UniProtKB/Swiss-Prot annotation:
This is Mitochondrial intermediate peptidase. PANTHER family: MITOCHONDRIAL INTERMEDIATE PEPTIDASE (PTHR11804:SF79), PROTEASE M3 THIMET OLIGOPEPTIDASE-RELATED (PTHR11804). It comes from Botryotinia fuckeliana (strain B05.10) (Noble rot fungus). Cleaves proteins, imported into the mitochondrion, to their mature size. While most mitochondrial precursor proteins are processed to the mature form in one step by mitochondrial processing peptidase (MPP), the sequential cleavage by MIP of an octapeptide after initial processing by MPP is a required step for a subgroup of nuclear-encoded precursor proteins destined for the matrix or the inner membrane. Its cofactor is Zn(2+). Residues 26-51 are annotated as: Disordered. Belongs to the peptidase M3 family. The lineage of its organism: Eukaryota, Fungi, Dikarya, Ascomycota, Pezizomycotina. The gene is oct1. Pfam families: Peptidase_M3. It catalyses: Release of an N-terminal octapeptide as second stage of processing of some proteins imported into the mitochondrion. One of its GO terms (molecular function) is metalloendopeptidase activity. The keyword Phosphoprotein does not apply.
């Protein structure tokens, strides 16, 4: 089965999770204050000093950016070069030309693979199928991004049509027998496999497993049922996510009963003394955290935790169809189908990990519950005994407010984090760890989708130009508020036959050279004599700028700094994971390994040595006093055990729903959820009558892999401790440590067993086999600092 990059269940769980539930941020560094002197900047590489200075200015100085971007447009004096320098995409019609050209190339590859009959021809099957995947991704990934991001409706529509055309072709390939048989023949011939590179072996194995999942070898009737089920799942899943509703959409109270809630917020929902609060959204969450009247809090809590009957029905129908699909594909359950190519390998291993993590976390949560109960007993009169489910968020909020009142205002922190200095800091950090830096690059006419977009070239000390990063970081009307990292084109080696094929395109005047034609005009590099298409990445954030003619730069909150570091963790994985084959490049690795580099970067964002590289007051240029960060981290970590418990239970729930239980006539998603809370939780259990699982939208996107973010939190914390020495003695900015991470983890993308990557970077052979024992060991490491 051929897959595109965007088909991964999620790109960035850190940001996506905020859409469904409010979650306390994980503090990712020790809060103990460590004094750190400013670290000198390494500007030894040619042009590095200029790039370092310019990097800050293009984000922090509107005047400098206006001059920088305007001069680039004037200097080229030429027509539009196309989005991302893709020469086809100079106008809406170009998307159809791009799709049709790619489609013809893909069809030639399919014919070539299907007609293979000699050893020499079979030797190329793995690489040809990888190129086929790349051709699909070139159109689908880029078009998917453009249709969601570009402000021009005509271009959006053209991108959508190109996306649909290639996606339809991909589905045809995935239900057509022949490609899988040819791959099987190649893999079963020792003479052929012996001549393959390590990457070719890995890619062939990935494709073989994917073909098996697609039921392509089933009898015709069963295969048709598989296709029908897949279509039904693709329809009911989005319906469940997009149209989930509460049983009671609104609750009405006399405004006098909402004492404690922000009066400004209350007035927004009040008419003639009656306050009508929507039960889903920020207002209800704020009420549960702040309303003093326990009966009111209880009523709101019950409503926010009770999905409509139709929503729960859609959820259970989705689970039943997935269970049937798995059985049809000869798997014990959908979890077995989904986890076979993940680090976990099986549901049993995930359970081992979650139970070990739960055991490690349980004592922490019990302490937090005890603190909440003690606070309730000393600050309430006549309320219900014990800690009730509707008490938790309220008393957490009360405790945090009392702590916050004795600390510095966290708003002061943002003065030390102008966007330009943070980008400068990321570049300096990457230079120290990995020998790559971010270099501002003037864009050509038509290259970007908005005038606010900055292009950064990634420059390596040893390999020169290695990636292109488009940064769309400022807020504007109509733009999605959710931060994200998009891989628009993956790394891949371009072969000599491809250059020969491209000669016909370069002769029509659209491209100047065969090399340009082979990659549609987008960035390439010929380091070490090998031509490669370079990773092309888009980074989207929604940072607020000052309105009008203010010269003040965009100032980030500390949470926004962590978010930017997180997203750049995905980017550095794409940048350093420049493999020869597309299927294993960068972030195209096991789902439960993909978040590791990004979560690890959150640790760097809170480290004194890293912050000393860049965090300075935007007006006075004074360095950041680290105790301000330490206070913020201590506050964020106050109840992290409770958050971890919730994530553990949701991960267990995801696993249970994707077992064979949905095929039972007595399947009840509510009973399963409440039973898991009772068995594994120390926090108050949801009351009878509630059915919160109807709001668990990630069940569709994650499908047995919700544990992944917890898993990667544990891995990231362990690597931070072992490899980067918890940041002690400058361990967070030492090249040797960065090289260890790059050589053992990042450079492989998905081309190496992630358990071998983990064992190598930690020098811990106990986990190399990746069995249930290894999962239990990882779970025992825990997430608590």
């Amino acid at each position: 089965m051929l897959k595109v990059t965007t088909s991964r269940p999620w790109v960035c769980s850190r940001c996506v999770r905020r859409q469904v539930q409010s979650r306390r941020r994980l503090a990712t560094a020790s809060t103990q204050y460590r004094e750190s002197r400013p670290v000198p900047v390494d500007n030894s590489a040619p042009g590095a000093k200029r790039d370092d200075r310019t990097l800050r200015q293009i984000f922090d100085s509107p005047n400098f950016w206006a001059e920088f971007s305007q001069s680039s447009k004037q200097s080229y004096n030429r027509p539009a070069v196309g989005l991302f320098q893709n020469r086809y995409l100079v106008n809406p019609q170009g998307f159809e030309v791009f799709a049709n050209t790619s489609l013809r190339k893909a069809q030639r590859i399919v014919d070539k693979v299907l007609s293979a009959s000699t050893v020499e021809e079979y030797r190329h099957v793995a690489r040809e199928l990888d190129r086929l995947s790349d051709l699909l991704c070139r159109v689908i990934d880029l078009s998917d991004f453009v249709r969601a991001t570009h402000p021009n409706a005509a271009i959006q529509a053209a991108a959508s049509r190109a996306y649909a055309k290639m996606f339809e072709y991909m589905n045809i390939l995935n239900t057509t027998t022949g490609l899988d048989k040819q791959l099987e023949i190649a893999m079963a011939t020792p003479e052929i496999v012996a001549g393959w590179t390590e990457e070719e072996v890995v890619v062939a194995d990935i494709l073989r497993k994917d073909f098996a999942k697609s039921a392509i070898d089933l009898p015709r009737a069963q295969r048709e049922r598989f296709v029908a089920l897949s279509q039904e799942i693709s329809e009911i899943g989005p319906e469940f996510v997009d149209y989930m509703t509460p049983a009671k959409p609104y609750l009405t109270f006399e405004s006098s009963k909402l004492k404690g809630m922000d009066p400004v917020l209350v007035r927004q929902y009040t008419t003639w003394g009656q306050t009508k609060i929507p039960t889903i959204g920020g207002a209800a969450a704020a009420a549960i955290r702040s309303v003093q009247n326990e009966d009111v809090r209880k009523e709101i809590f019950m409503a926010t935790r009770t999905a409509s009957r139709n929503t729960v029905y859609k959820l259970e129908e989705l689970m039943r169809k997935r269970a049937e699909l798995a059985k049809l594909s000869r798997y014990e359950s959908y979890s077995h189908l989904a986890l076979g190519d993940k680090m976990a390998k099986s549901p049993a291993s995930v359970s081992q990990f979650l139970e070990a993590l739960s055991k490690d976390n349980n004592q922490i949560v019990e302490g937090e519950v005890s603190e909440l109960l003690k606070f309730k007993m000393s600050n309430s009169h006549g309320s219900s005994p014990g800690l009730q489910p509707w008490d938790k968020d309220y008393y957490m909020s009360q405790i945090l407010a009392s702590v916050r009142s004795h600390s510095r205002n966290s708003d002061f922190l943002s003065a030390y984090f102008s966007l330009g200095t943070v980008m400068q800091g990321l570049s300096r950090l990457f230079t120290r760890l990995y020998g790559v830096r971010l270099a501002p690059h003037e864009t050509m006419p038509g290259e970007t989708w908005n005038s606010d977009v900055r292009r950064l070239d990634v420059i390596s000390e040893t390999d020169g130009h290695v990636a292109v990063l488009y940064c769309d970081l400022f807020s504007r009307p109509g733009k999605s508020p959710n931060p994200a990292h998009f891989t628009l084109r993956c790394s891949r080696e371009i072969t000599t036959p491809e250059l020969e094929e491209a000669s016909s395109l370069s002769q029509n005047g659209l491209f100047k050279t065969n090399e340009e034609a082979a990659n549609d005009g987008m960035a390439t590099s010929r380091a070490s004599g090998v031509l490669k298409q370079l990773p092309t990445i888009a980074l989207i954030c929604d940072f607020v700028t000052m309105s009008g003619k203010s010269s003040r730069p965009a100032l980030l909150s500390f949470n926004e700094v962590q978010t930017l570091f997180h997203e750049m963790g995905h980017a550095i994985h794409s940048i350093l994971g420049r493999t020869s084959l597309q299927n294993v490049s960068g972030t195209r690795c096991a789902t439960d390994f993909a978040e590791l580099p990004s979560v690890l970067m959150e640790h760097f964002a809170a480290d004194p040595s890293v912050l000393s590289l860049f965090a300075r007051h935007y007006e006075t240029d004074q360095p950041l006093p680290y105790e301000m960060v330490a206070e913020k981290l201590a506050l964020d970590k106050r109840f992290e055990g409770s958050d971890t418990e919730n994530q553990i239970i949701l991960s267990m729930l995801d696993l249970a729903y994707h077992s064979d239980l949905p095929l039972s006539p007595s399947f009840s998603s509510t009973q399963i959820y409440h039973s898991l809370q009772q068995k594994h939780g120390a926090l108050p259990v949801d009351p009878p009558g509630t059915c919160w699982q109807g709001f668990f939208g990630h069940l569709f996107g994650y499908g047995s892999t919700y544990y992944s973010y917890l898993f990667d939190r544990v891995l990231a914390r362990r690597i931070w401790q072992v490899v980067f020495k918890d940041g002690e003695a400058g361990g967070s900015i030492q090249r040797d440590n960065g090289e260890k991470m790059k050589e053992e983890v990042l450079k492989w993308g998905g081309g190496r067993d992630p358990w071998k990557c983990l064992a190598g970077v930690l020098d811990d052979g106990r986990v190399e086999n990746g069995d249930e024992k290894a999962m239990a060991i990882v779970g025992s490491w825990g997430v608590k600092e």
